[in-house]
Amino acid sequence: MKKICPNKINTINEKEILVVDVRENFEFKEYRIDVENIENIPLSEIDNKIQEFPDNREVILVCNNGLRSEMALKFLEQRGFRNLKFIEGGIVKWIQNHLKIIGNAPDIVSHSLSLDKTCGK
């Protein structure tokens, strides 16, 4: 699986990389990770918006906890996309690694799933 831990990301603001938040629009408007090249394409709309995914640059998918972004990755790979990764643990692990977000995540996000900020366990 092509996953990347938030504490290993150091090049996410490069112009060649596109971050796609696959949460619903209302979630994205409330809070999101603080990176330059980010778009919101909800998992529920990916099939209708598949043409918005570039096939010539790396795409990193993110959601709240990694579940939807992993599903999106599998869906896109089945349709021929190859330059894909997803953020393991999603925004939860992003926050646990003290990385910046825009907006205010609810307290439950920062306390859900895991108290461990590392990945791969």
For the regions a protein language model found, what residue spans apply to each?
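Rhodanese-like catalytic fold shared by cysteine-dependent sulfurtransferases
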Residues: 1-18, 25-58, 67-121
